Amino acid sequence: MSPGRAAAVTGAVVLAAWTVLGWRLAGSGDSAPTVVEAASTVGFVGLPYVVAAMILAHRVVRAARGPDLPARVVAVATAGRPRGVDWGAALRAELAHIDGRAGRWRFAAGCVEAALVGGSGRLARATAVPVFVVFAVLTFAGSRFMLAGQRVGLLAGIYLVALAVGAVAAAVGWAGRSFRAGLVSGATALAAGLAGVVAVAAIEAVTWYQRAGVWIIDGDVPAGGIASPGAAVTDAVVGMTSFGLLFALPFPVLGAALGAAAAGAAAAVRRRVSAGSPSG
């Protein structure tokens, strides 16, 4: 299957799944679902998943070249490393001299581990703590601002987490001219940032419970009241984690693709300008 066809098929499958899910989510309330509600859910939440799935399918199929599955795994694991092209070629050449299915799979697993631990993985881990701190501080500030004002809840700003994660992935993908670097950094930023949000939200949920008696995620007052501080904390942890992942999960892929594409376009422009310049 060609990369383009793989992307189209994957996108169609994910879109169909989100169409069904969007209809179910739209009908989760007291009223019957409407086409507009389902379409808005698919467009606002599902469409990023469709595009991200198409990007991943295209890149994986394009990179997966080899005589068997271990060779394709190594090819995918070593793809997208502009500063490690020789390393990837050396690994693929070494695999070609390994006989036996078990030995080839062990080698492929080692290549995957090395690809995840080294290079862009080290950069991503180095930025995890600063990202955690920034998201935690912003969550605390947003919590206190909302508590003193309209009390709409932290869920109102959850899409900002997705955009910030996408921005990190795009910046790293552009700077490193690598989709892989952007993807790894974006995924790490998502994990670290969401951890910062959830950690602070869990603590602040008790403050919202004590001062206003409302849920921190949406500012709603439950009919029977909040049973205990523990219930407020559980709602904050489960709600912010689930909605954070729901909205932000595709954005490391989208940001990395955008950053790498922008870097590639800029490099192509520079090459054309250099080729058109008169030689001294």
Q: What is the predicted function of each stretch?
A:
Residues S31-L47, A156, G224-G259:
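Hydrophobic alpha-helical transmembrane segments
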Residues S2-P3, I55-L69, A79, L116-L123, ...:
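Cytoplasmic membrane-interface segments at the C-terminal ends of transmembrane helices
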